[in-house]
Amino acid sequence: MACGEVVVEGRSVPRVANPRDTESALNWQLERIGSAAWLDWPLKFQRMAFGYANDSGWHDAADAVSWLDHHKLLREGQAPRGALVWYHAGDRIRVACSLGSGQVVGPLLTGPVEVALLISLSTDYVWSDPHFPFGH
């Protein structure tokens, strides 16, 4: 497999840039601070932040983590700015976007879009690049 490609269902798919770059995606999210419209839609929120209007191809964050893990795209340690942070919250996996310095943004457990310290949400997390292989 050549660098910059992802294998999907036995075929190689070239990686493409997201429609929105990292800073634009973060700005999109920060403009929505306080909005409760995204309650229980953290994956959809992140997909839309990075510029994809249509479905990600994943049922939920747990499905995404399973796919990313299978393709060895998950990382441990401090997430860089713009990375997707996948964390356990209660009985399910959630996703937020790293602002760097241990902070994340997204629709958090309490509902509205917020900025929070990751450590206050969970100590069980991994991160990935903002990659939506099925997004369009």
Map each language-model feature to its residues.
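Structural recognition of the beta-strand scaffold that forms the well-ordered cores
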Residues: G82-Y87, V95-S98, V104-G106
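Secreted/periplasmic proteins that engage bacterial cell-wall peptidoglycan
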Residues: M1-G90
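Generic detector of ordered, mature protein regions
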Residues: W58-W67, R92, C97-S98, G111, ...
